[in-house]
Amino acid sequence: LDFAQEWYKEIWEEITEILLEAGKYAKQNEVRLSVHPGQYTVLASDKPNVVENSIKDLEYHSLYGSMMNLLPEDFSMNIHLQGLYGGTHDAGIKRFATHFPYLSDYAQKCLSVENEDKPNGYDITHTLELAQRIPIRCTLDTHHYDCHRMVETERVKVEGKYVNRKVREVDHITVTSDL
């Protein structure tokens, strides 16, 4: 991305070399790398400027995987669905699905969504519903699930057809400092 090259122009060559080396190491050691863009990356937003900035942020993060020469199955960008804003879950899911095609092909293939830790937020059933509409990976964050038990176990049913992206499953576990 042009803005990333501008920000880091003085060390761009060095960054490129380091990332290529990191990617080579990850492949040789079968390490799957992931990033977790921040809470302001909201593809389900109803605000055009937030969506535009979210797309830029996701493209910026996907640049790391690309510069490491990693295939999407070896690099993941994990975000929350978000974007409820007093509306319905379905409206947010529709907005996310509408904005998703504006991402580059590589960014789309690297992106995954996870359940949230907020009461009345998007739970794993909502992320699975999104995966019925668009080809996106879903992550169950056990920390968020355990904190709020927002989803009753019997409600979590994997039904329908999902895209098999030949991606190794990944556990996303958060451990707090008091454990």
Task: Name every feature range the model reports, one short phrase each.
Residues 1-11:
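Glycine-rich, proline-tolerant flexible connector loops at the mouths of alpha/beta enzymes
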Residues 52-55, 133, 147-179:
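A short alpha/beta connector and helix-capping loop motif
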Residues 11-137:
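Active-site acidic/histidine proton-transfer and metal-coordination neighborhood
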Residues 143-145:
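Non-globular scaffolding segments
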Residues 3-4, 44-46, 123-125, 148-152:
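A short acidic (Asp/Glu
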